[in-house]
Amino acid sequence: MEPYATSDQIWQGALIFSRIGAVLLMLPGIGESYVSPRIRLSLALVVSLALWPVIAGALPGLPATVGGMAGWIIREVIVGLMIGALLRSFLTALATAGEIVALQTTLAFAQTTNPLQASPGTTVSAFLMLLGTTLIFATNTHHLFIAGLVGSYELISPVAPLVTGDFASLAIRTFGDAFMLGVQLSAPLLVFALIFNLASGLVGRVMPSFQVFFAAAPLSILLGLSVFALSLGVVGTVFIDRYRALARIFAGGAGG
């Protein structure tokens, strides 16, 4: 064995690093702006070296031209960004649920900086997204990310044509499922808001002189947050189960 890396080995390492680095750039909890670029770069390098013996056989040979090399690198970066964006987009389910909860508890005006989004959002939405990211690592779901990196080389082989139609269909279905899940997670608050508003309207009709708004506003916040706290365990469990199912789409290629 040669004591130094050959040109083919360097080429394989560059291809692996291109896809894995792009995926890690988008993953929840790892690709955030508050995570140091040095940490992300080091993690991508370590994971690339660890997975090199496993996926080196699925990589194309060294092209004869610089243009060919650049084309392969760009292709792998695009594939990595697509996979990472798909895994990250499912967090919009929690953002949707948080916005609905905030609207139903009259807390939509309470805006805060959301570290997982580029724009500020409601406090409830930021809390749910941070909770979801924490659960991903607390339940070892991030292990499926590593298995998914390996499996992605079987689902989207570097030597096969890049089929964007299938991935676009998967992305559309994922966005639709994320929105539907967000509404489902906020269903207890929607039911509570419907009953509470009907009761408040009935009281206002029965006792016109009673100041319903001044009594209903604090009760809406108190009871709404109580219902939200009681349903929080179910929200976390349902989300992490659905997220693991999404991650297994790629991990399944590696026998995950």
Predicted regions and their residues:
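Hydrophobic alpha-helical segments and their helix-loop boundaries in membrane
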Residues: 1-256
